[in-house]
């Protein structure tokens, strides 16, 4: 089980090690980024038996990633785990924690996961690629929430053409375009007074 958080923040590091110590009580193998090794070793709550790995190897070897923080931490993990098709469990350390499943007061629920008593919610993601005019791929990534096309800091409308499977859908002038998954559409729908999509709906 990989544990991911910002170990530079004292409270988050303490929370992560509390989770690690709980899981070690069930003989789980705990993985943490090698980048955070010094901060973990210096923490008084460190009890040993944590494996420190390069970040890519950590995601490759983990059967489950536990992300402690706010929605941003979960979104970052989702981007890295997309091509690996492995589950993420969010534990909320932020304010709202829309995507987190647990609070720190609910750590006893982790025993159910160890016992195999859980279900996995599968969410649609966006496969993003930026291609230049000559067909060269400039950027590739994944997103659990949304992809935004904008003109940056320039206050000027841009000409947009939207295609779906090589078929032109529409042309318009605007300051940008937001392509959102059901998971990422919630805030946009609420701000527009619209209905909220079930995040498990397929794109």
Regions found by a protein language model. Name each.
Residues 1-64, 105-119, 130-141:
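ATP/NTP phosphate-donor binding region
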Residues 95-175:
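Catalytic core of DAGKc-family lipid kinases
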Residues 76, 80-93, 98:
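Gly/Ser-rich helix-loop-strand patches that form or flank binding pockets
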Residues 12-13, 72-77, 185-191:
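Short glycine/serine/threonine-rich phosphate/pyrophosphate-binding segments
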Residues 65, 88, 177-178:
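Short, well-ordered beta-strand core segments
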Residues 170-203:
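Gly/Ser/Thr-rich active-site loops/lids in small-molecule metabolic enzymes
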Residues 3, 67, 179:
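Redox-cofactor binding/interface segments in oxidoreductases and associated redox assembly factors
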Residues 67-71, 79-80:
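N-terminal glycine-rich "phosphate-gripper" loop used for MgATP/nucleotide binding
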């Amino acid at each position: 089980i990989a544990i991911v958080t910002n170990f530079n923040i004292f409270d988050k590091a303490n929370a992560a090690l509390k989770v690690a110590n709980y899981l070690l009580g069930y003989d789980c193998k705990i993985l943490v980024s090698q980048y955070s090794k010094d901060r973990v070793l210096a923490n008084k709550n460190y009890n040993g038996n944590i494996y420190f790995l390069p970040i890519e190897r950590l995601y490759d070897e983990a059967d489950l990633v536990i992300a402690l923080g706010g929605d941003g931490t979960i979104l970052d993990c989702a981007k890295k785990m997309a091509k690996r098709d492995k589950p993420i469990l969010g534990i909320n350390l932020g304010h709202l924690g829309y995507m987190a499943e647990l609070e720190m007061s609910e750590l006893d629920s982790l025993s159910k996961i160890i016992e195999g008593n859980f279900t996995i919610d599968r969410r649609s993601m966006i496969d993003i690629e930026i291609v230049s005019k000559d067909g060269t791929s400039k950027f590739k990534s994944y997103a659990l929430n949304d992809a935004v096309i904008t003109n940056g800091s320039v206050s000027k409308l841009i000409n947009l053409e939207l295609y779906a499977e090589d078929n032109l859908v529409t042309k318009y002038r605007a300051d940008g375009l937001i392509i959102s998954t059901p998971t990422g559409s919630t805030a946009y729908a609420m701000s527009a007074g619209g209905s909220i999509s079930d995040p498990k709906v397929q794109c």
